[in-house]
């Protein structure tokens, strides 16, 4: 039997469009089984943690973020804020809230990746066992640092926390739709991948790294 070009193109189009839909359906279906994480990991020894927080002109939010975060630290832990090309008083506020602060001024090399690299070089002077990257505008739920640290140390690989966006009611329907799409992308799909035994993407905040991975 032969297949004409039009039919072949039709099957190719269906496969191209249908495959992502099938993958998404599978991820959502498997995610419905819930979180199958093991609580045994939490019984492991608590590693020494450094929370690395890049911050560019975050004076409006950084104090609130640090007040929620610092009580979660254990003895030997620390928070390092990289005040990156700031034109406000981010550094002063972070220092008064109890964080260690380093200032970075380099207007040719801008961006989060440069700030993180700068912070890692500073941490290397007294290397922690686990580095957790948290953005300055994130709300860190109670207990999150401890769980991330233990998971990362036990598995000796990067670990991503649940990272959600909360849309103010004033944003109306478009904001609520965006928040729902964010939940599917950052919660449902990664949970499905986890239950299937696959890795999920790292999202740039709420991410823990073993020091052995960071230093390379």
Task: Label the predicted regions.
Residues 67-76:
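Short, acidic, metal-binding catalytic loop of nucleotide-sugar glycosyltransferases
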Residues 131:
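Short aromatic/hydrophobic "clamp" motif used to bind/position activated sugar donors
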Residues 83-91, 106-108, 138-139:
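A conserved acidic beta->alpha catalytic loop
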Residues 103-128, 147-216:
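Long helical/loop segments within the catalytic core of UDP-sugar-dependent glycosyltransferases
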Residues 63, 89, 135-151:
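Acidic donor-binding/catalytic loop of UDP-sugar-dependent glycosyltransferases
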Residues 58-61, 86:
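Donor nucleotide-sugar binding loop of glycosyltransferases
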Residues 1-43:
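N-terminal membrane-anchoring/stem segments of glycan-assembly enzymes
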Residues 47-50, 78:
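Cell-envelope/extracellular polymer assembly enzymes that use nucleotide-activated donors
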């Amino acid at each position: 039997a032969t297949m004409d070009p039009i039919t072949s193109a039709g099957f190719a189009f269906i496969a191209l469009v249908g495959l992502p839909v099938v993958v998404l359906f599978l991820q959502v279906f498997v995610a419905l089984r819930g979180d199958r994480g093991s609580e045994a990991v939490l019984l492991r020894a608590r590693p020494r943690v450094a929370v690395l927080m890049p911050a560019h002109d975050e004076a409006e939010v950084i104090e609130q973020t640090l007040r929620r975060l610092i009580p979660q630290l254990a003895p030997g832990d620390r928070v390092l804020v990289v005040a990156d090309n700031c034109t406000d008083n981010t550094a002063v506020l972070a220092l008064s809230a109890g964080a260690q602060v380093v200032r970075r001024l380099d207007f040719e090399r801008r961006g989060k990746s440069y700030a993180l690299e700068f912070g890692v070089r500073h941490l290397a002077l007294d290397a922690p066992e686990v580095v957790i990257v948290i953005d300055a505008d994130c709300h860190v739920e109670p207990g999150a640092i401890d769980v991330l640290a233990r998971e990362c140390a036990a598995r000796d690989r990067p670990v991503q926390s649940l990272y959600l966006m909360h849309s103010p009611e004033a944003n109306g329907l478009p904001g609520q739709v965006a928040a729902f799409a964010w939940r599917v992308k950052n919660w449902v799909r990664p949970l499905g991948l986890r239950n299937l035994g696959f890795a999920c993407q790292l999202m740039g905040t709420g991410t823990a790294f073993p020091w052995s991975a960071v230093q390379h």
